[in-house]
């Protein structure tokens, strides 16, 4: 991914 996002568990996803 490009922007920093958080999944339903609060983990950072890129």
From Swiss-Prot:
Question: What is the annotated signal peptide range for this record?
Answer: none
**Record's InterPro entries?**
Gastrin/cholecystokinin_CS, Sulfakinin
Indicate yes or no for the key word Kinase: no
What does the UniProt entry say about where the protein is found?
Answer: Secreted
- State a GO cellular component annotated for this protein: extracellular region
Look up the domain of life of the source.
Eukaryota
Q: Does the keyword Secreted apply?
A: yes
State what this protein does.
Myotropic peptide.
Family statement: Belongs to the gastrin/cholecystokinin family.
Which named protein is this?
Answer: Neosulfakinin-2
Q: Which organism is it from?
A: Sarcophaga bullata (Grey flesh fly)
Taxonomic lineage per UniProt?
Eukaryota, Metazoa, Ecdysozoa, Arthropoda, Hexapoda
């Amino acid at each position: 991914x490009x922007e920093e996002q958080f999944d339903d568990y609060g983990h950072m996803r890129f």
